[in-house]
Amino acid sequence: MDSGGRPRQVIRKVAERYPVVLHGVSLSIGSSDPLNMDYLHRLKRLAQEVQPQWISDHLCWTGVMGVNSHDLLPVPLTEATLDHIAARVHRVQEVLDRPLILENPSTYLDFRANTLSEPDFLRALCARTGCGLLLDVNNVYVSCFNADSDPADYFDSFPWNCVVQMHLAGHTDCGTHLIDTHDQPVRPEVWALFALAWTRSKGAATLLEWDGNIPSFEDCHAELLKSKAYMKGGLSELVNRLTPDPVPLAISNPVNFMVPDVMAGAAEMKKG
């Protein structure tokens, strides 16, 4: 994040030409550990340099007692957790001097102690802190499948007025459960949810995530074209054929693609 050298030079050059956003996985907003202030101050220095449109992370915890699990672990959806995370969001926003954007995680279990639904928890968190939301449509589908619940019900109770950005990604079907792997094309069921989310969010900025088995640029571009077709409210037979099969080529760094037309508004915001 603050190593300097070529990585910093590249992000500076990108930020000079395009609107950028910063998306993290290490904030651990739900942990019982104290906030990592060194991490926050380094993040703030990076943000001051590249001037992102927003900074986002996940509604999760990644470690405890100083040990990083390197995973995005779910939090109990209770009033006590809400109080805890709201206080931490306030502190993060004070340090960063901007609203924080939080993403719904993919989940593989529910806590017996849960007293709130995830949409209700997120709505209350936004109301208390002024934070925004990053709606990961694939995570909604994965979590609802694993919990044997209906994503349509999730959408019906979701605080759409708080959505700043959306994510699309592929997942792995393990039969009895789904895993959010980001190494497959977006599934048809997720595209259908995205079409609904696009309308309800009034066209929130959208990003396609692909972290492993990364195919050719042409195949990635085809997925972007498919997303634009859904944004326009329909798909032709041709566009339906644009979803590629996974290519067995893995690289170590994720490749994330902003849908260009959706970012036009963010670019105008940056000029302003």
How should each PLM-predicted stretch be described?
Residues 36-133:
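Active-site acidic/histidine proton-transfer and metal-coordination neighborhood
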Residues 1-10, 16-21, 42-50, 68, ...:
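Extended recognition/assembly regions associated with phosphoester-bond processing machinery
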Residues 217-237:
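C-terminal helical cap(s) of enzyme catalytic domains, especially alpha/beta-barrels
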Residues 1-9, 28-38, 108-116, 141-148, ...:
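Acidic-and-aromatic substrate-binding clefts and catalytic sites of carbohydrate-active enzymes
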Residues 7, 18, 26-28, 59-63, ...:
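Active-site-proximal loop/turn and secondary-structure-junction residues that shape catalytic pockets
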Residues 55, 136, 166, 206:
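Conserved, mostly hydrophobic/aromatic
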